[in-house]
Amino acid sequence: MCAILGYCGRGASYEVMQKALQKTATRGPDDSRILDTGNGFLGFNRLAIMDLSDAGMQPFTRNGNAVVCNGEIYDFRELKELLEEDGYTFTSGSDCELLLPLWEKYGVHMFRMLDAEFAMVLYDKASDSYIAARDPIGIRPLYYGKDAEGTLLFASEPKNLVGLCSKITPFPPGHYYRDGKFICYRNMSAISYTTGGNLDSVCAAIHDRLVSGVRKRLDSDAPVGFLLSGGLDSSLVCGIAAKLMPEKPLRTWSIGMDVDAIDLKYAREVADYIGSEHHEVIISKQDVLDALEPVIAALGTWDITTVRASIGMYLVCRAIHETSDVRVLLTGEISDELFGYKYTDFAPDAKAFQQEAEKRIREIHMYDVLRADRCIAVNSLEARVPFGDLEFVDYVMHLDPELKMNHYGIGKYLVRHAFEEDELIPRSILMREKAAFSDAVGHSLKDDLQELAEQTYTEEEFEKKSAEYDFAKPFTRESLLYREIFEKYYPGQARMVADFWMPNRSWPGCDVNDPSARVLPNYGKSGE
């Protein structure tokens, strides 16, 4: 990952800019630079991924314009060729160098052209103004706010803006900002039509698009690794990558508790099958408890399930950073939002299933995508998410929801069937029931966190303290514990997150008071 910061106005202070940018130094430990545009500043912390030389350092400048971008542009070679045909020249191998030529040629229409995950802030000399934009899913983070004098700031993380802005707001995915307005250029959750097809043709399309999504994300000048939980999604990503890169073993990592890890054996089975160089990170109860506060500080959220699931990811990424030269990690996020969680088995009809999928994609930047970004970036690594490939997401979201519902006796059947003949991973893994990530790391992880919360507050203290919050009021001692840690680092900024992630409680079988799939009546053998 990298970090970007735009302090957009003549009232901007260089010293304040410097201190704010330093707060996300771990996102980009290789180099740091601040550019004075004459009307504010653009700042960049670099984690070198494409073109590791100094030529790839940002901000990029051209004809008085300037840009900083935290992103990966997967079609940059094709776009570069088009620009070169028009006479543009380039001095680096960085994918982001083409952004200013694109701006000169296409203006705001450039954002729709990008097959990318990105957050950027661009200074336009002609108008002496700033333009900001974020990818359609929100895989790369971006926040904004105004300082006490009303000067606008954009930043990779809310921590850059704490103490500067009284209100910090997530930049809406699929939008660009210009002249005081946020304009949607692509909405991945606005589905006006759906398409059908027979099962085999649909699964063939899913297969080819996911393989393409993995292939794009293997393109890196820095070493690549893989998070392998042993569940379907990460195992498929690893299996596809192993077939695409047969010349050398993948490097894979998994994590589990020292007492009751569920997924370690499954991850080991996949690693043996694909022949990866596999590493296991074993953690204790104390590791979990010690990680809680730094995890919430990194996440910038109080959401229960996001915090739980982040503990394992944070600790495994810390181990990767400390023991290897890997810079890029491929992960399995976003599959659940597209094909369904355990709770979506209870969707009353196809329309309800589709509406829930649209909601999950619309809000994913506050939950699973946020978790992957922060836990990985705080350890100076970059996350890449093949299931978040724009063509893949667009195709699946437009599929007839009847096809995606669990009519097959097992969830996510379309993905499973799509790869049934490839034999990329063991069939036992391909057809394995889903387990929640925090549960898969170890059932005791959730239990240990709840025990800590129960020991922290009496019932009277819980009632008194939770009553102090008028937004997203804590409803368990665990949720209160997370909220109080959040407020320590992000005071008064709770509205950055829309609500607690929970199953759709209006559906039969989903009226629960905990986000864990373990409390659902259909959890069955998922946790075995």
Across the structure, where does each feature detected by a protein language model lie?
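Short, amphipathic alpha-helical segments that act as regulatory/interfacial helices
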Residues: G6-G9, L100, E104, L315-H321, ...
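Peripheral terminal appendages
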Residues: E157-N160, D200-S201, D208-R209, G213-V224, ...
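Cysteine-centered catalytic environments shared across enzyme families
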Residues: M1-T301, T323, R327
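Amphipathic alpha-helical segments that form well-ordered structural scaffolds
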Residues: L98, R209, G213, V270, ...
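Short, surface-exposed acidic
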Residues: D31, F90-D95, N406, D422-A436, ...
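ATP-dependent adenylate-handling ligase core
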Residues: V259-C317, T323, G340-Q354, R374, ...
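An alpha-helix initiation/capping motif
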Residues: C96-E97, P101, A116, A204, ...
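Mid-to-C-terminal catalytic subdomains of enzymes
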Residues: V326-Q355, E363-P474
